[in-house]
């Protein structure tokens, strides 16, 4: 049974989960992996499609990645790394 609550942390986690699902959905058919750096990732992100994590767009989250986050192996890896940069408002 799913416990639903209006707790802000719950809302934030739900946003992050949705963000990850949308990213994986978008990238699952794309032939862009491995992604070696921020430039490649920025080019791979959908143009004109909003992919927000909470208040922040995926393109903004890319700027927060470090060299240690690359290479990105697959859509799941990408979703996890970008979601980790997603700020959670509590």
Curated annotation (Swiss-Prot):
Superkingdom, taxonomy of origin: Archaea
Gene3D superfamilies: MTH865-like (1.10.238.80)
Full protein name: Uncharacterized protein MJ0738
Species name: Methanocaldococcus jannaschii (strain ATCC 43067 / DSM 2661 / JAL-1 / JCM 10045 / NBRC 100440)
């Amino acid at each position: 049974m799913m416990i639903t609550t209006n707790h802000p942390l719950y809302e934030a986690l739900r946003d992050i989960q949705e963000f990850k699902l949308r990213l994986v959905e978008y990238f699952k058919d794309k032939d862009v992996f491995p992604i070696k750096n921020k430039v490649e990732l920025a080019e791979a992100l959908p143009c004109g499609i909003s992919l927000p994590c909470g208040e922040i767009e995926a393109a903004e989250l890319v700027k927060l990645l470090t060299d240690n986050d690359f290479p990105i192996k697959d859509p799941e890896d990408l979703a996890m790394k970008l979601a980790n940069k997603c700020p959670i408002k509590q």
